[in-house]
Amino acid sequence: MAKAKGNREKIKLVSSAKTGHFYTTDKNKRNMPEKMEIKKFDPVIRQHVIYKEAKIK
């Protein structure tokens, strides 16, 4: 039997400081349909900045 396709989708979190740094994660599209914004550490500038969701190419 084939497995059902999951609700989780892989996303990329890109730094708003324009350093080029990003994190990859996944999120449940059903529970969180809006774009994710989260404050995380950017090691390039050594500060906490807002990371915004982008599609993985």
Swiss-Prot record:
Whether Ribonucleoprotein counts among this entry's keywords is yes
Q: Which InterPro entries match?
A: Ribosomal_bL33, Ribosomal_bL33_CS, Ribosomal_bL33_sf, Ribosomal_zn-bd
A single Gene Ontology biological process assigned to it is: translation
Q: Which UniProt keywords apply?
A: Ribonucleoprotein, Ribosomal protein
Recorded GO MF terms: structural constituent of ribosome
Q: Which Pfam families match?
A: Ribosomal_L33
In the UniProt record, does the keyword Ribonucleoprotein occur?
yes
User: Where is the secretion signal located?
Assistant: none
Cellular component per GO? cytosolic large ribosomal subunit
Per its UniProt record, what HAMAP family does this chain match? Ribosomal_bL33
Q: Which family does it belong to?
A: Belongs to the bacterial ribosomal protein bL33 family.
The identity of this protein, by name, is: Large ribosomal subunit protein bL33
Which species is this record about?
Shewanella amazonensis (strain ATCC BAA-1098 / SB2B)
